[in-house]
């Protein structure tokens, strides 16, 4: 799917409150020079590692408060200030609001957060060493804070603003146990019941393998699909983690049953070391992760209805994911033959193997036979033979040439039922209207189209479906070829399956 098509889809999902060109311009304002500028200030030695309550932490808060004011965001802290102090005034969250445009929905909030503190000079309790040196925390988490500032600036370019208000929260004290986000959840500056969704950007500066990690996609139904449809890059891969750990500022919101997503680009050797410096940042990757965050925030702020928290997400684990995506037991072959690669000189295919006891063996097929016809279909070459075998009715008439000029017509009782497409699926309770492929039959139409196990099917011939039964009815009724909207690792693509008819 092209970037233009993705942008159009995102705007459509967001209710088309702005044109695609305006949305795209706002997204493109998220630029490497601006990300770099914020990140280099926050991770400079002058900030002394931004430990909560320290001189460097206060300097970082002053810089960030100034940037929030320059963007024209409304203060949402104590006494009409950007700061919310806690721990006897030693620590300070920074809070600002961009008001929504909808008369009713603007009283709901999409919270976008990142912690700005780090570990200062490092100790044995919070550093992987060496200790006593400035830990600049460029990735952890100057990168996330810089991304949130860029999202805030991009939102100010949209006219009108999104329907819901967006609350930007820069947390203090995360490295001391998520103190800032915990304090805010216990002492919210907007009613907690009005927070429709929360986002957390933590360590988004070290994109590798073009893969971003998203946590929390099971905290509401449909979030994986929602995230994939918001992916602004046709190249970006998304790893949807099922882990639910108390390891960053999204967790206090999960505890309060608020749908939550965290954007993350992975741990690395520099994590919690003095070497986590600005020159190690993948700025291009950080801009891609930030654009994904922007797309998600825009969609969350414009949804017509709020997402409901999935309580089951708190107990789900990677082991549950493995069970869902576990490939199905392979099917037994219907005919039981193998054939030689075509030489391009003659029609038909020459059998190189006949499995003992198989349908082919029972019908009398032999190695060396040249298969010319299967049912009503002439075997011109090997490319579609496998799909034809899987789709054929039984018994089937097979025509072979055994010796030059010796043509035989055999009746074969094929094993198993006909398969038009050659894939099977499971349903995921967290993703209604989606199926997870768990079987791709070798040489089937699905196999030839390039479908893979763990692919998700979202649409069939531009039609949604409610469940697997409805999908099965669609697949049985549509003429070939059949276009499928498929998600693979967070990327959308259209896969066209040339499925033979099943009698």
Regions from the PLM with identified roles:
Residues 157, 269-318:
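His/Asp/Glu-rich mid-to-C-terminal helical/loop segments that flank catalytic regions of hydrolases
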Residues 23-29, 45-55, 85, 130-141, ...:
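Second-shell loop/turn segments in exported
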Residues 171-268, 282-286:
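Metal-dependent peptidase/peptidase-like ectodomains
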Residues 360-383, 446-469:
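Conserved PDZ fold ligand-binding element
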Residues 50-99:
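A non-catalytic alpha/beta surface segment that caps or lines the substrate-entry region
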Residues 96, 105, 112-118, 123-177, ...:
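Alpha-helical metal-binding/catalytic segments enriched in His/Glu/Asp
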